Amino acid sequence: MMDPAGRVVMLSGAARGIGRALMERLLAAGYAVSAGLRDPGRLAAHDALSVHAYDAGLVGSAEEWVAGTMSRHGRIDAVVNAAGINPRATMFDADESAFDAMWNVNAKGPMRMIRAAWPHLVACGEGRVVNISSLSGKRVRNDNLGYAMSKFAVMALTQEVRRAGWEYGIRATAVCPGFVDTDMTAHVKHVPREKMSRPEDIAALIEAVLRLPNTASVAELLVNWRHEDTL
């Protein structure tokens, strides 16, 4: 298992939910974290934590964040894409704006982030990429097709990172949670909150993946709060 001391993790979506839980866990473990969020004022920077403006839907934002991270920390060892949106977009919606927004933020945002950080991940020889996908990226169980399509795309992106980065020591994992008790599932009424997975559960799994050596790579982690016989 790799020692976190001296390793720098770029983490989007750190202000809330899974991203916030992961940030706190990584800092406690001894990682340095570069947090990217749309409103940097929501977090207070300190020695091990730098806070940067980042909008996953804005072209050029990833490059600015990478530059700020290198200026502050001097290296990038891992990228965790935890930012995402989940408006409703069904197959029958004539207005495709929600589809476009999710494709831009959920699928293209992580791609732009990885591309911007790529040279630094290569340079460290043990680069790590973790993309927060969803069980909706493995099967379709409701009418929010737009969200599922964007998360299926994250699975494809993760596979390409594994293919393109393998010889450089880059390892990538797609983490696919079911319902997690965060504000993104506030609309879910048919599942009691206490039965859902906790953000801290997902954070623990991600930290474990980040610690794995190059000789033990996990392609996908499917995590659910209940038994599901379709997976």
Q: What are the roles of these predicted feature ranges?
A:
Residues 90-91, 98-100:
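Substrate-binding pocket helix/loop in short-chain dehydrogenase/reductase
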Residues 82-87:
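Conserved NAD(P)H cofactor-binding loop of Rossmann-fold oxidoreductase domains
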Residues 15-16:
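Conserved glycine-rich cofactor-binding loop
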Residues 134:
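Residue(s) in the substrate-gating loop at a strand-loop-helix junction
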